[in-house]
């Protein structure tokens, strides 16, 4: 599994979301690496990591990530996940024995009824648009008004995002060979199972953007019901990616939570 390491100190794993890569974490990477050794992965079928053989699912990705951590002597590492990656770190926390402290940022898998269709349909349309727009993506990424028109579902303040961050992310979305299959699995596959109270003994925080238009804020209550040992942190004025919209607050939450482990 391709990954980058930056900084020195206690290891900290970063797991990106659907279509992303390790570069998704660039807004907070250096701040975290100032005090931690950051390991940011490209999940299978993303970035420079080839796709999995066979079915592509949350369970399969969780198995692959567990194997990677064991191979890197990182079992028990503190971890942060975003979106699909947030669901992955919750799943590994549920299984037990793989991760230390966990911060799960706007996790998927807690939708019901029409929310599944909204999630699938909106991202299905978005990825097709992003693929069509690749020839002009450098212009879109570099123009604040164009970024705002393209990314309102992902960010509460697209005009403030780094053009390079947006270009990297949109290139990664378009290039991921596993995007379509994972999108369908996330929307219509198995829902995220939970754990009984007291099952998770390491620090666990679920963070949610108040303006998330991918994983709707109403789903946070369901996530807490399934992971009753978790603490919920709300990010105000924030969309689906807290590390994009409120990087300083996100960095502080991560460092404070993982310092307890």
Please annotate each region the language model reported.
Residues 238-251:
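Catalytic histidine-centered segment of alpha/beta-hydrolase-like enzymes
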Residues 81, 85, 89:
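Gly/Ala-rich beta-loop-alpha elbow adjacent to hydrolase catalytic centers
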Residues 102-134:
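Flexible "cap/lid" loop of the alpha/beta hydrolase fold
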Residues 4-50:
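Conserved HGGG/HGGXW glycine-rich cap/lid loop of the alpha/beta-hydrolase fold
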Residues 138-198:
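Conserved alpha/beta-hydrolase catalytic His-Asp/Glu region
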Residues 210-215:
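Acidic catalytic loop of the alpha/beta-hydrolase fold
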Residues 200, 206-208:
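Short beta-strand/loop motif that positions the catalytic acidic residue
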Residues 60-77:
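Conserved acidic catalytic loop of the alpha/beta-hydrolase fold
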């Amino acid at each position: 599994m391709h990954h980058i390491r930056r900084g020195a100190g206690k290891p900290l794993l970063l797991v990106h979301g659907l279509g992303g890569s390790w570069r998704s974490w660039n807004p907070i990477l250096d701040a975290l690496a100032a005090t931690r050794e950051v390991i940011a992965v490209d999940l299978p079928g993303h970035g420079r990591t080839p796709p999995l053989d066979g079915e592509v699912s949350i369970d399969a990705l969780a198995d692959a990530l567990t194997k990677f951590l064991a191979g890197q002597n990182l079992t028990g590492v503190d971890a942060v996940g975003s979106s699909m990656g947030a669901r992955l770190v919750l799943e590994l926390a549920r299984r037990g024995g793989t991760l230390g402290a966990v911060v799960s940022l706007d996790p998927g898998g807690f939708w019901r009824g029409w929310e599944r269709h909204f999630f699938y349909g909106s991202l299905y349309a978005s990825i097709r648009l992003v693929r069509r727009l690749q020839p002009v993506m450098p212009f879109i990424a570099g123009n604040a008004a164009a970024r705002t028109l393209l990314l309102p579902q992902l960010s509460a303040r697209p005009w403030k995002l780094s053009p390079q961050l947006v270009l990297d992310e949109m290139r990664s979305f378009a290039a991921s060979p596993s995007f379509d299959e994972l999108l369908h699995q996330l929307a219509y596959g198995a829902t995220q199972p939970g754990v009984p109270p007291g099952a998770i003994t390491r620090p666990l925080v679920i963070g949610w953007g108040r303006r998330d238009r991918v994983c709707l804020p109403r789903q946070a209550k369901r996530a807490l019901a399934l992971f009753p040992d978790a603490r919920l942190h709300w990010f105000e004025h924030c969309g689906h990616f807290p590390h994009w919209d409120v990087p300083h607050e996100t960095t502080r939450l991560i460092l404070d939570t993982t310092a307890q482990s």
